[in-house]
């Protein structure tokens, strides 16, 4: 076992503070509309320029092991806030640094760390309750655009695009962010249900210009097994051909004789048909086939349910107004399923999302939900250079997460003012002793820090003066760092999602409390590389003197 180095009490906390400060001081320069960029060196390719707190935090690794522990604890604040709310990572870092700094002063003066922690926890609970109290719900396109604009570092183009995307696909719709081929940033909306499976043969194409199979007023056969034998497929083919409507076949696979027969009949004009593989794998495939069946009013022909392909009737087939199939994707528009069944399926998937513990599963469930409830919006991000593209794409993703958070829990006034207004909630925090009262006061002081930092980043105004002026005001009155004016911030579009502000404070207090109650740090003793024996001359043994 490797020998360990142990550092105790004041020495340990002082070193942890150095690490906390190194990370926080690097991250907090990005806060607010006047925040600066941070340039990050990459081993390969061009450096990355970013104004995203969590991106900066994730890049910081310190040489000293205990300092690095402090830095990594605060990095956890940024990461957790990003995971939960998608934004507010810099605010969380600033709050964590302030709580730890003020707490350390009191521990050094003889306060009991565990009572400080209890006071901090009680204070945070009351502040969160006050934030919820002053929160207001959002629904309009204009309010959604405001949240997106602020989270994208005051880029109104991005705010408008996100608002338009949400307007098109709904609150539960999937909005994906991709890199555009050109310089233009644009929104593309895919109506209906799209899945990533294209036609099994180019001979199914009906439009040779676009290389797509276009089926109008189509029937849909949904089967969860492979189809290789024409005999089992023939009865349902004959029944659908009699109706004169085109047919889309979705199955695990279609091969051999069955595929060849379909292609020949399609070329002769006997059948209007197209065949695609079923989307997904395993249990997810079964669920997606069921989604398609409900959306189109059809039935999944599955032997597990007692249905056989050779006995299938036209009643088992789904229906859609239009289906478009290219070499990569199938899009079903205006499925003829009943609204009651579709709503029931949507609620079922929402329930699964609430119970899901895996980020991957949640993402896939949300995709399925969107395909059932309104479609998919794609934001194609354009820029002049790759460096600008990556930076802009990161901002769009942040703004998208923040906007979703705002829809969930509402918004509060931005610019650090909501935390100032929430200070009045501390009057409800009860302390059992002086040290707990000190813990409450630590939060009181820390809540001012984001506003101080936003002002400091403007480089032109005194933070203490601004803080006093904002405290004297009420409601939405605050300092707009972009225009350097005192005004009604909500009217000026300076708002934050309540979830972002709440998560930032909760996560910051949690990690700062852990650091305050730390009494010892254990690290590996670093090996001294200079003590390593030198390689003997003449190369490696058995290599004949080769290097």
From Swiss-Prot:
The keyword Chaperone applies. It comes from the Bacteria. Residues 538-547 have a biased composition (Gly residues). One of its GO terms (molecular function) is ATP binding. ATP binds at residues 30-33, 51, 87-91, 415, 496. It is an enzyme of class 5 (isomerase). Its EC number is 5.6.1.7. InterPro entries: Chaperonin_Cpn60_CS, Cpn60/GroEL, Cpn60/GroEL/TCP-1, GroEL-like_apical_dom_sf, GROEL-like_equatorial_sf, TCP-1-like_intermed_sf. Transmembrane segments: none annotated. Residues 528-547 are annotated as: Disordered. GO terms for cellular component: cytoplasm. Signal peptide: none annotated. It catalyses: ATP + H2O + a folded polypeptide = ADP + phosphate + an unfolded polypeptide. Gene3D superfamilies: GroEL, GroEL-like equatorial domain, TCP-1-like chaperonin intermediate domain. Disulfide bonds: none annotated. Forms a cylinder of 14 subunits composed of two heptameric rings stacked back-to-back. Interacts with the co-chaperonin GroES. HAMAP family: CH60 (MF_00600). This is Chaperonin GroEL.
